[in-house]
């Protein structure tokens, strides 16, 4: 099947999906309706581009016909030639774009995410840097019109982040932030350093797609839920009623504690969101590890401990080690203007996938 047959098949399926989503039987089946809605959304950009491409092809045909029929009208012929030139250039651009749009889609790209950031090697300095990363992602989310909600956080004595869990919601969140998982290294002079020496510290980032209950169901028998009194700074109990929730997935040992909300039910709901994402991610990682060759063709190796990026403060430099990208814009990037880095990662990933398909 050539590229045009593939595009026509995508358009035909898109139209079929539109009819299915109007079918009362489909609407009443929540799981199927969600699956078909996602499929329609994932193909919409491709179909729109293909329809625009077909219009460009028609414009080329019309311009060629106009040149033939100009009959000595120099002005009309010149106008038609200009239209032909522009349309041919547009045709080439659309063909390149459509090749990328036809690449196999990551089914999670349109999803919201659970974002986890932890201070790692480097003590207080690592925790402070984890706080810088949190601010960077919060500000980037603002530029994208996304909702950023801190679900759970733990700070240290100097105001750094030991661990933070956040939900980021909006359009195509996972597609842009999925490349952020890994170890982020910082090189700078800590505030407490009297000799002016540069120290190296690390914070880790984990990005997981949000998993709906209809997509991944956890057997309640596999969960142990403990209810306890939420504690504040210094360990004092801050609620007379036990509202904090500790949830453990027994088969994997994955644990979530939630006490940010004032009611037990809200803490339970948030804990369930996180544990569902973590358990699904745990098994997805096992499956990914079994497909080692495929994993190596994507950005990085998929290893969660892989050092993906270095932030060098003295030189105002950010280096992404996976794609060899270096930018002297550390201050700009940490202020949330991450597009240049993320766009480069997306482009690299798409190029790698195109090359793999052409082999």
From Swiss-Prot:
Query: Has the keyword Transferase been applied to this entry?
Result: no
List the Pfam families.
Answer: PCRF, RF-1
Q: Which residue positions does N5-methylglutamine occur at?
A: 236
InterPro entries in the record:
PCRF, Pep_chain_release_fac_I, Pep_chain_release_fac_I_sf, Prokaryotic/Mito_RF, RF-1
For this UniProt entry, what is the primary localization, expressed as one broad class?
Answer: cytoplasm
Q: Name one GO cellular component term.
A: cytoplasm
Report what the Swiss-Prot or TrEMBL entry states about this protein's PTMs.
Answer: Methylated by PrmC. Methylation increases the termination efficiency of RF1.
Task: Name the source's superkingdom.
Answer: Bacteria
Q: Give a GO molecular function annotation for the protein.
A: translation release factor activity, codon specific
Q: Which UniProt keywords apply?
A: Cytoplasm, Methylation, Protein biosynthesis
Where is this protein found?
Answer: Cytoplasm
Task: Name the protein family.
Answer: Belongs to the prokaryotic/mitochondrial release factor family.
| Its job | Peptide chain release factor 1 directs the termination of translation in response to the peptide chain termination codons UAG and UAA.
- PANTHER family, per this entry? LD18447P
Q: What is this protein called?
A: Peptide chain release factor 1
Species name: Streptococcus agalactiae serotype V (strain ATCC BAA-611 / 2603 V/R)
The major lineage groups are: Bacteria, Bacillati, Bacillota, Bacilli, Lactobacillales
Q: Which gene encodes it?
A: prfA
């Amino acid at each position: 099947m050539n590229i045009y047959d593939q595009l026509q098949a995508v358009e035909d399926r898109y139209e079929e999906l539109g009819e299915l989503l109007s079918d009362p039987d489909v609407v009443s089946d929540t799981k199927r309706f969600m699956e078909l809605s996602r499929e329609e959304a994932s193909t919409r950009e491709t179909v729109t581009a293909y329809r625009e491409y077909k219009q460009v092809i028609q414009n080329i045909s019309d311009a060629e016909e106009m040149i033939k029929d100009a009959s000595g009208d120099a002005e009309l012929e010149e106008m038609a030639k200009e239209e032909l030139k522009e349309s041919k250039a547009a045709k080439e651009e659309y063909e390149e774009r459509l090749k990328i749009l036809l690449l196999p889609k990551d089914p999670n790209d349109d999803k919201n995410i659970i974002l986890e950031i932890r201070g790692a090697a480097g003590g207080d300095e690592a925790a402070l840097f984890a706080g810088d990363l949190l601010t960077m992602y919060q500000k980037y989310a603002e530029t994208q019109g996304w909702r950023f909600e801190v679900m759970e956080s733990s700070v240290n004595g100097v105001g750094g982040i030991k661990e933070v869990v956040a939900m980021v919601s909006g359009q195509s969140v996972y597609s842009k932030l999925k490349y952020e998982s890994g170890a982020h290294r910082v090189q700078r002079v800590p505030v407490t350093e009297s000799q002016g020496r540069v120290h190296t510290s690390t914070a880790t980032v984990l990005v997981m797609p949000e998993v709906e209950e209809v997509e991944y169901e956890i057997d309640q028998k596999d969960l142990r839920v403990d209810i306890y009194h939420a504690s504040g700074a210094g360990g004092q109990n801050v609620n007379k009623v036990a509202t904090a929730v500790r949830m453990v997935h027994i088969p994997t040992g994955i644990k979530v504690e939630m006490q940010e909300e004032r009611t037990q039910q809200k803490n339970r709901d948030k804990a369930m969101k996180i544990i569902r994402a973590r358990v699904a991610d745990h098994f997805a990682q096992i499956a990914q590890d079994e497909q080692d060759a495929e994993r190596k063709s994507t950005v990085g190796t998929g290893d969660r401990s892989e050092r993906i990026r270095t932030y060098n403060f003295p030189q105002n430099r950010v280096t992404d080690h996976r794609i060899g990208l270096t930018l002297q814009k550390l201050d700009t990037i940490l202020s949330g203007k991450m597009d240049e880095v993320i766009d480069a990662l997306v482009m690299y990933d798409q190029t790698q996938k195109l090359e793999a398909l052409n082999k």
